[in-house]
């Protein structure tokens, strides 16, 4: 089955910050190429790195890798974000479920949906990219309990994916 990579959007491709008052997080991330302000109506303010997009396009094109959106952007990720920033994610499967979120009872919709998808699709290993993983104890426990290799990456929301994160991903899928 290969590797399934589950991807959030904000805090992954969009380094969240108010770009009117801050500079891109190039120094903190290791991405020295062009950074651009996010200009998509309704999105969080921030920057996106052309280097991150190129690296993720390379990862997504790797044989045996299937990428799926797991983001509150839902349909907006493949239809708005991906084409705007040049990410080859318009054809990635989008896993809906944000309407089912129940944080008051400690039930994070993303954990529910990734569990269901892993049980259904049975990948050999998974990569989970989300800037909120480390804040959900149930997600951290689930990742440790899985009987397949897992790489869970939780970037700082204001930085997004770093060069070191992409190196980890590329080594994991190799």
Regions picked out by a protein language model, each given a short descriptive name:
Residues 1-102:
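Alpha-helical substrate-recognition element adjacent to the catalytic core
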Residues 76-174:
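C-terminal cap/substrate-recognition subdomain and adjoining C-terminal extension
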